[in-house]
Amino acid sequence: MGHYAPDGAYPEGIGYWDYGTSFNAMFLSAIEKAFGTDYGLSELPGFLKTGEYILHAVTPNLKNFAYSDNGGTAFLAPTMFWFYDKTKDASILYNQVQLYKKDGQKRIKKNRLAPAMLIWGASASLANPQIPARLSWKAQGDNPVCFMRSSWNDSSA
């Protein structure tokens, strides 16, 4: 989990983030359910901040900031609901709600972890997604990144 330090950026882009982080979230959920604690693993440097990495890596027109060998199409990431559950930051789900509104049924059918959204997002209100306050985000780490935008809901921003 050291790759998330110090600020939550992931070295290989958001496709690999989704793959690796989804297993982290499932493991942390399982041990927390079994033992009542995740033994501080979610508190490791950068981990709880990494949801912001994905939030900011998706553009207002629902494309990915594509680097490494990742594609440019944004995708539904059920793991973002785990980050919502842990942080109670409703804005972390902003892009997920937009993606679902665009073509959610198609996206859910293709996602192996879609049922986890029901568990991790049980307390989320998705009817009126909270627009994130920050228009920029930067992170150091294995592959430093900086994302900037002028708006969350203007597709040309």
Language model: regions and residue ranges:
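Acidic/His metal-coordination segments adjacent to aromatic residues that form catalytic metal sites
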Residues: M1-G13
